[in-house]
Amino acid sequence: MLAVLGNHDWHANRRDEVAAALAEGGIDVLERDHRILEVCGAELGVAGTKGFAGGFDGAHIPDFGEPLLRAVYAESIREAAALDAGLRAIALCPFRIALLHYAPVTDTLEGERPDIWSFLGTDRLAGPLREHHPDLVLHGHAHAGTFAGRVGEVPVYNVSVPVLGEDFWVFEMTGAARAPSEVH
C-alpha cells in the first residue's frame, strides 16, 4: 500500500512520526518519489508527492515579495518538479498513477470557497500531468470539493473522505482503454 502525507501529517513537525507509524502498518510513504509494482503480472508505476499550495491561473502566488511568500512559491515549484521526475521514472509502465495531497486542478475544488483555492493546490502540478498523461491522478485535501475533474484528457479524482462519503474508493485499471473505470 502506498500513501503521500498531507498538511495534517506535517502539522506540528510530526512528519517522521506519522511516516514511521504508517511504515509499521506496511504503508510505504512516497515523498517526491516513485514506485514500480507488479500487479496481476503488469507493472504499475506510481509517482507520489505531497504537492503544495500556490494558486491557479490568474491567482498564482508569485516569486516576488517577502521571503516567506517566495518560499511558498519555491516549494510549489519543487513539488511540481518532483512530480515531473516521478512521472518520467514510470513513463514505460503500462499503468501509471500520480498520487498527490494538494489539488492540481480547480475542477475538484468546486464546493470549496474560491478565496481559499490558492491554499488547496496549484495548477503548477498540472504541467507534468499534461506532459506525461498518467492514467489516473488521485488527491485529497479539498474536503468540501468535488469528486472528479480533468487536466486535459487526464482524469483527476479528489478522494478525500468527506468528498467520497466513504473510507475508500476502488478504481479498476483496464488495459484496453488505458483509463480507469470506477468500481464502487
Which residues are covered by each model-predicted region?
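Active-site neighborhood of phospho(di)ester-bond hydrolases with catalytic His/Asp-centered motifs
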Residues: 1-7, 28-33, 97-100, 129-145, ...
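Acidic/His-rich segments in extracytoplasmic proteins that coordinate ligands and/or metal ions
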Residues: 2-20
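Short, flexible micro-motifs
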Residues: 9, 51-54, 143
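Short N-terminal helix/helix-N-cap motif within the alpha/beta-hydrolase-1
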Residues: 12-13, 107-108, 147
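Conserved catalytic scaffold of divalent metal-dependent phosphoesterases
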Residues: 16-117, 160-162, 173-175
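Binuclear metal-dependent phosphoesterase catalytic core
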Residues: 37-40, 110, 123-135, 143-184
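Structured catalytic cores of enzymes that bind and process phosphorylated ligands/cofactors
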Residues: 73-74, 78, 141, 183-184
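A short, acidic, amphipathic alpha-helical segment used as a generic capping/interface helix at domain edges
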Residues: 83-90, 121-131
